Amino acid sequence: LKLYTYLAPSKVCDGVGVFALTEIPKDTLIWRIFPKEYHKYKWEEIPNEYEDYVTNMTFCDEEGFKIDCDLDRLYGAYYVNHSENPNVRIGKNDEYISTRIIYKDEEILYNYPPQDRIWQ
């Protein structure tokens, strides 16, 4: 994949965000969420007191969660912030795809599903 992004202080929250290094055309595959290897776990495999931590640090759904086998290699998807006006979507094969032209230095934003909005 072509390098399209960089990390910098977010413009929408107190933290880090992902920004366009160059103009990104509409319908461009920016990156895949999951690398070649990850472990999938069911919710019943962990104690209830760890659920909040797991939802903060992994990709999860109603069935369970996935942990990247190579967390030494974090990529942009870990730093994408929420917006009601997103400029990316998640494709059927777990990839981030631009929904419109994303301009150079514009923050990349995704509309998290309600169950993923843990800060609310």
Locations of regions flagged by a protein language model:
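Conserved catalytic SET/PR domain of SAM-dependent protein methyltransferases, capturing the structural core
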Residues: L1-Q120
